[in-house]
Amino acid sequence: MDSPFTDVAVLLTGVGKRYDIVSAFAQHATVIAADPNPLAPAQYAAQHRRAVPRIDDPDYVPALRALCDEFGVGAVVPLTDLDLEVLAVARAAGQLPAFVPDPEIARATFDKYGTHLLLQRHGLPSPPTVLPGEPVEHFPVMVKPRWGSGARSIHRADDIHAAEFFVHYIAEAAMVQWFMDGPEFSMDVLSDLDGRCLNVIPRTMLESRGGE
């Protein structure tokens, strides 16, 4: 039976190797897969594929806008967090129908320390987190890059000497966060463009490959 949504065009960005996700979208919509890598494997699960400029290229958003016009795209959905802020700014400016949060939220979620402060402002629990040079009151801790994703360059430190070593070892802006032991849970939240929560899917994180 044909899906009633096959006439809906969805532009997926940063498809990379996320073949299963692209394939799932393609079963219910006309999918345009966009990635800077013209050989990205997941693009072959879509009905249409396009190589686009890199996220940091000023022509990135205009290229996506052109694809929206060409295919009548009703939704731009990023499959990576790397372009969240870029798409959020474009959405706020009325350039793209992107399914992303407001720019302030997108900016904070890519900045782990910014996320910590955002959670605190809203009265939500967050592990004690400090920047290098600030006092650490509890060990062990995790030393990790302040910006970025993919569970990269994360190191456990059991004392202040190890923490100071790893702060310099990762060679980029770092933060120090209380080590949280026990099972890790990830919550996938589906919301509409007005920020209303439609569904939440909790998952136990058994393994992380590139943050997924």
Predicted regions and their residues:
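Short beta->alpha connector loops
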Residues: 14-18, 81-82, 132, 160, ...
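Short, surface-exposed amphipathic charged segments that create phosphate/polyanion-binding patches used
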Residues: 66, 112-118, 191-194
